[in-house]
Curated annotation (Swiss-Prot):
Organism name: Sus scrofa
Molecular function terms from GO: aspartic-type endopeptidase activity
Gene behind the chain: PAG2
UniProt protein name: Pregnancy-associated glycoprotein 2
Main localisation: secreted
Matching Gene3D superfamilies: 6.10.140.60, Acid Proteases (2.40.70.10)
Extent of the signal sequence: 1-15
Compartments it resides in: Secreted, Extracellular space
GO CC terms, sorted: extracellular region
Glycosylation, residue list: 56, 79
EC number of the protein: 3.4.23.-
Coiled coil segments of this chain: none
Similarity annotation: Belongs to the peptidase A1 family.
UniProt keyword list: Aspartyl protease, Disulfide bond, Glycoprotein, Hydrolase, Protease, Secreted, Signal, Zymogen
């Protein structure tokens, strides 16, 4: 088997390290099973894109603010260790943020009690950086302090690595999450000031030949997914990698040419932006564009689906019981983006065109079945439109399960190829 370094396609034998990822139940699924999702969404309205675009306003004085893009659907986790001797943690390898953080033993919040926590006094290599940090999320907050220690990711070792330790975590999303913390893989420009990102530290310490990493997200229920550092393994994709230049070096953001269905443009008609994000499960887009997609789904499968923006105009349905009226409003009887499961076979591909290359997403991918109630849901979700009206999409795991993705920080580009 030949390992390839992205920049020069030079054969490697020792430089590529692969970390297995496990697909676990998302926070959204956990909340839905417990009947908590509806109230949670009411209590925590979230503007994903506005948080993404406000990154530069987050670093104020000695605090660092970093938004988490999708607070319910982080489902692929891997293991790392911190300290000497190593303390183990399960983290999300997240291309939408740049910092590493885990809970600390000083955190007594409910979210921390249910997760593993780092004990600085048990590590001979720990150093307190003497800086407070505060991470703001759509679903809550994490506050703590900055430390540094030895971080091990598989066979890779990052010494003197800066990371956050939480002292307080609020929000049900943290309480119900399977993961302990987050390992950010975005650019240094959105990291805590004065710190070096994990990927840059690995390169600086010659642990990897190039600042390159790649994701293969398996469609299997649990095992088979990997994140690889320093190169790629060709067995995880078919054909050649198609390279896409970044439009900015903060998040992994690229230009999206258009979105089509059976040759008809249904989104991004004049070109727009897309963020490729392993920390997001769904396909997120502007509300009008997503409504158009769901209208098309309704047209093709002919029944049951109602555009969400129609709920405001629909009347109450009234049940009269023992001469007493019990109205049920449309907000209750129209669930969000429910699709008959048998419609998946009839629905067409939705095609994302990136850098003049078509990337089809079939209905089997964008219509997901919930194992608990056998209902199917569209994985297209709308986000609040931003003040500047820029059309931005988030290509999450629905897209990344179909396409093997390489993140090349050295040349500021993303490589895409059909996953095996």
């Amino acid at each position: 088997m030949k390992w390839l370094v992205i920049l020069g396609l030079v054969a490697l034998s020792d430089c590529l390290v692969m970390i297995p990822l496990t697909k676990v139940k998302s926070v959204r699924e956990s909340l839905r099973e417990k009947g908590l999702l509806k109230n949670f969404l009411k209590e925590h309205p979230y503007n994903m894109i506005q948080n993404l675009l406000s990154k530069n306003s987050s670093h104020v004085q000695k605090f660092s603010y970093q938004p988490l893009r999708n607070y319910l659907d982080m489902v692929y986790v891997g293991n790392i260790s911190i300290g000497t001797p190593p303390q183990q943690f399960s983290v999300v390898f997240d291309t939408g943020s740049s910092d590493l953080w885990v809970p600390s033993i000083y955190c007594k919040s409910k979210a921390c009690v249910t997760h593993r926590s780092f004990n600085p006094s048990h590590s001979s290599t720990f150093h307190d950086r003497g800086k407070s940090i505060k991470l703001e999320y759509g679903s809550g907050k994490m506050s703590g302090f900055l430390g540094q220690d030895t971080v091990r990711i598989g066979q890779l070792t990052s010494t003197g690595q800066a990371f956050g330790l939480s002292k307080e975590e609020t929000g049900k999303a943290f309480e119900h999450a399977i993961f302990d913390g987050i390992l950010g893989l975005a650019y240094p420009s959105i990291a805590i000031k004065g710190t070096t990102t994990v990927i840059d530290n690995l390169k600086k310490q010659d642990q990897i030949s190039e600042p390159v990493f790649a994701f293969y997200l398996s469609s299997d229920k649990e095992e088979g997914s990997v994140v690889m550092f320093g190169g790629v393994d060709k067995k995880y994709y078919k054909g050649d990698l198609k390279w896409v230049p970044l439009t900015q070096t903060s998040y992994w953001q690229i230009a999206l040419d258009r979105i089509t269905c059976r040759g008809r443009v249904i989104g991004c008609p004049r070109g727009c932006q897309a963020i490729v994000d392993t920390g997001t499960s769904m396909l997120h887009g502007p509300s009008k564009a997503v409504a158009k997609i769901h209208s098309l789904i309704k047209h093709f499968e002919k029944e049951y689906v109602v555009p969400c923006n129609a709920r405001k105009a629909l009347p109450d349905i009234v049940f009269t019981i023992n001469n007493v009226d019990y109205p049920v409003p449309a907000q209750a009887y129209i669930r969000k983006y429910v699709v008959p499961c048998n419609a998946r076979k009839a629905l067409p591909d939705i095609v994302f065109t990136i850098n003049n290359v078509d990337y089809p997403v079939p209905a089997q991918a964008y219509i997901r079945k919930n194992a608990n109630n056998n209902r199917c849901y569209s994985t297209f979700e709308d986000i609040m439109d931003t003040l500047n009206q820029r059309e931005i999409w988030i290509l999450g795991d629905v897209f990344l399960r179909l396409y093997f993705t390489v993140y090349d920080e050295g040349q500021n580009r993303i490589g895409l190829a059909q996953a095996t």
